[in-house]
């Protein structure tokens, strides 16, 4: 714990302490929050106050005495670099005419007593402890990114084993798989729909393909092709006819390496 010397204490208060000094916990020696100079300052000035305070604290560390002192100084400068990059427009105060902007992370931290306490606790630690904290935060950020997986736009279907021909066929509903295995499938019709979908979504992967189909078996084949290609298909009544709508759930269109018609021929 950081302690301050109390010059007003008498001899009776110095008992039990080396040198006759009385040490008080830091929180009890601080002025009240309501009368604090930092409280009366704007957010930008308050940010600069904490930065200057950190710089002054770092200047107290001898810069040419040992590896630990140098490491502590480098950690402090590294944190200040991160914090300064999060600030707003330079030279603008609260009263200046400027477009409203949401407060940065550092401004919010300066207004939060818990964050300030954590920052002070970090600054009071040794250089080795600070290094461990920074290393832990970096590792934690990388592990969270791995847990989130690929972001939107990162398509890994080519190397994903879930997109092998067998897994693509298993993606088709059980009822449709039974029909494809037991019935005599008109391969020409199946290949025609595969060719149409390939041509359409290869050019416009985010568009919606529509078709009017009154034949229920042909709609069934189209549903099967869409499920095999990982497309979304739905049918609805439109002016007494059945309309099919097909859309792509991904940003890009990557068809399986083996089409459904070829897969059925291999396993017939």
Swiss-Prot record:
GO terms for molecular function: nucleic acid binding. One of its GO terms (cellular component) is nucleus. It comes from the Eukaryota. Its main location: nucleus. Residues 187-250 form the R3H domain. PANTHER family: R3H DOMAIN-CONTAINING PROTEIN 4. This is R3H domain-containing protein 4. It comes from Homo sapiens (Human). The gene is R3HDM4.
